[in-house]
Each structure stands twice: as structure tokens, then as C-alpha cells.
Amino acid sequence: MNILISNDDGVYAPGILAAKQAVEDLANVTVVAPDANNSSVGRRISLFKHLKLDSCELEDGSPAYSVSGSPADAVIVGADYVMDEKPDLVISGINQGVNISCDITSSGTVCAALEAVSLGIPAIAVSLFMDPKTSFKQDENGEWYPEYDFTLAKKVLHDFVLKIKDKGFPQGVDLFNLNVPSNYDSEEVKITHLSPRMLDKHVIDNTDEEKSEIFKYPLDENQDGDDLIMIFSNLVKDYEEGSDGYALLVDKCPSLTPLNANMTSKDLKNW
């Protein structure tokens, strides 16, 4: 079994090393990922643009490749150029942050998996849900920093890929969106559906001194027109039972959502 691993946090992010470690005993693993953070870029691809491919090493010294492009670019380069044969499976992640609800269409993590599907390769997008109350620590200077615990995510990913290796990818499913909480009550993986939305999104005027002080975004002096910043807030909490959000926030267990790339709505008969 040959697996291509990519992400949207960048090739040096700790999550991609965790993903490799989770499955390296099950398959031949090739890591190809963006050379920098590409969160929330969706399925952007660099058509007719120069891309730079470099060899590099992960933190454990294992070989990898960096691409000067998007997560979708990295998947295409990995599957079509780096690997001698098309991979049997693409894993995107482990993302440093949750990817649930219909908001996943803006996720570089999920869209890297979608790009794999367009190439005829089944895929898994994997994300770590970090509880703001437990996943951030303060250093001696009082600065906050994220503390990533991929233990359960690695276990769930390993067991899931082992099942795929033994039984094959299920028919009627193009990709899976797997989200694993770092602070959990149960290790049981629940099959879920997408919630309608995850976050509230707002636009602020970056020239507003009070707001710009709160969010600490430097002014873009070279920009013409209004200097705006888009932010998100208020993680939605009224998830319905059976949804990905309910599994993560209420049941506090891993959520596995089967997805199809074909987004056709078949309910409309006439209009």
C-alpha cells in the first residue's frame, strides 16, 4: 500500500509528522506538503504558474518534499510527479484545528483530500479539535502557545487505515473527514453528518484603533481603499444530535463523516 500525506499547515508542522508516524508501519509513505502555512485557502490550484519542489526532512529526519503552492498543488505534485505510481490513499493532516460543518469547503486540509478524489484517489482529511480551555499553555513570559496532543488522533487514524487496508475503501464514499478531540470523554468513533455551520464570521475596520488594538493587526500602508480584516468567533454550540459538531462538543469523541465530491442536490424535481 502506498500513501501520500499532505496538509495545509506546512511541511514542518507537527501534525504531518504525527500522521506519518501513525501509518508508517502500514504502508510506504511519501510526504509532499506546502512549504508554508496555507490554512483556509480551500481548493486553490496554481494553474500555469511556477512551482518550486524541494527535498527536505521532517523533525524525525525522515525525507519529505515541500512545494511552493497550495495544499491541492502539493497533492497534485505528489501524485503526478513525485511518486512513481499513483498512491492508493491520500491523507491530509493532521490539521492543527477543527474542520467540521459545511465550512469545510474553505479548509485547505479537506480540499487537499477533495483534490485527491478528483485524481481518482480515495482520501482522508484528519483534524485535531483543540479545546481552548485545555490546549493552550502559558510560558514563563506569560505568552500563550498551543500544546498539541496527537495521541488519540494517531491511534484513530492508524486503526482506520488498517481497516481500509484489510477491507478496502467503502463503496459510495469518496473521502472521509475525521476530527479527533484532544480533550475527550470517549475514544469511540461516531459516524456523523455535517453540521450547517461552525463559526460566525465578521469583518472589522482595521483603522479602528480600539479594534485593531484588540486584534493587533498591523496596518497595510500600501493598500488603497478600506483596510479590512476578516475574523471568526463564537464556535456554534447548538449542533443537532448525529452531527460532527455534536460528537466533538457534546459527546467529546472522534467524528467520522463520509463525503462525496459530487455536490449535486437530488431533491429538486421541478421548479
What are these regions (language model features)?
Residues 3, 14-81, 85-86:
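A cross-family phosphate/adenosyl-ligand binding-site feature
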Residues 30-32, 65, 91, 122-126, ...:
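Hydrophobic/aromatic beta-strand patches that form the interior of the parallel beta-sheet core
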Residues 77, 85-139:
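Internal, conserved structured core segments that host functional sites
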Residues 5-12, 103-104:
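Short, glycine-rich nucleotide/cofactor-binding loops
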Residues 146-148, 167-271:
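C-terminal accessory domains and tails appended to enzymatic cores
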Residues 9, 37, 70-71, 95-98, ...:
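Short glycine-rich anion-binding loops that position phosphate/pyrophosphate groups of nucleotides
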Residues 118-166:
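Phosphate/ribose-phosphate-bearing ligand recognition and processing surfaces
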